[in-house]
Amino acid sequence: MYRPEKISIRKVPMQREDLIQSMFAPPDAPPVRWRIAPSLVDYPEAVETMEREAAAIADGTADELVWLVEHPPLYTAGTSANAADLVMPDLLPVFATGRGGEYTYHGPGQRVVYVMLDLKRRRQDVRGFVAALESVIIATLDSMNVKGERREDRVGVWVRRPEKPPLMDGSMAEDKIAAIGIRLRKWVSFHGLSLNVDPDLEHFGGIVPCGIRGYGVTSLVDLGLPVMMADVDIRLREAFERVFGPTRTENE
């Protein structure tokens, strides 16, 4: 009797870019509220607002929200933060936060995008959601002729720096231009992403950003693009709508 030969199939882990499927809400869902803070927002106020908005979205009493802010100079420590990565603990205020990830810097000139979406309506896929946020950043950068890239071993968006000395292993230098850190409660996201437009890059020296050693941090202005925050906001919104669907303006 013929017995088919058993074939061993090696499972290859899916890459984050393979997880990008539709993150659109159902067709009858209202547009996502798009809100831009007109001035610097203190971090505790931002957390309180996110908590309140996320709870209302989960309860069905508020529409989804994307909130764009800038913060005064500060560090935040995610749930995986290692105290050794806070290199200069007295340089700036430090806030513990419930988002994933490690230490990061926020300050003027950095666009922080707090994303409060109901993934029950969209897709209950955390890795896919992170990949979608990366796609928003990559598309935003691409609209300004900057090539942003994802790395499987490093969440966030990176740019190659051929003009810099190579890394210790001989590979090309890379700098981080955008970070991502999220939290979910009842499948509603909060926290989000940050894109370096023109922050004080020296402030990143007080931490090991995101716990990743050996890599630098850059910004759009550092790359030679003297862009205005308002222009970046327009491009972010266009990229967001291509990935997540329509938005509507909400004034503060």
From Swiss-Prot:
InterPro entries tied to this protein:
aa-tRNA-synth_II/BPL/LPL, BPL_LPL_catalytic, Octanoyltransferase, Octanoyltransferase_CS
Q: Which organism does this sequence originate in?
A: Rhizobium meliloti (strain 1021) (Ensifer meliloti)
**Which pathway, per its entry?**
Protein modification; protein lipoylation via endogenous pathway; protein N(6)-(lipoyl)lysine from octanoyl-[acyl-carrier-protein]: step 1/2
Query: Which family does the similarity line name?
Result: Belongs to the LipB family.
Main EC class the enzyme belongs to: transferase
The further comment given in this record reads: In the reaction, the free carboxyl group of octanoic acid is attached via an amide linkage to the epsilon-amino group of a specific lysine residue of lipoyl domains of lipoate-dependent enzymes.
Entry's Gene Ontology cellular component terms:
cytoplasm
The positions annotated for binding substrate are: 99-106, 179-181, 192-194
Q: Which GO terms describe its biological process?
A: protein modification process
Q: Which branch of life, at top level?
A: Bacteria
Which molecular function term from Gene Ontology is one that the record holds? lipoyl(octanoyl) transferase activity
Instruction: Cite the active-site annotation.
Output: 210 (acyl-thioester intermediate)
Q: Where in the cell is it found?
A: Cytoplasm
Lineage runs: Bacteria, Pseudomonadati, Pseudomonadota, Alphaproteobacteria, Hyphomicrobiales
Q: Does the keyword Kinase apply?
A: no
Q: Which reaction does it catalyse?
A: octanoyl-[ACP] + L-lysyl-[protein] = N(6)-octanoyl-L-lysyl-[protein] + holo-[ACP] + H(+)
Keywords of the record: Acyltransferase, Cytoplasm, Transferase
Q: What is this protein called?
A: Octanoyltransferase
Gene responsible for this protein: lipB
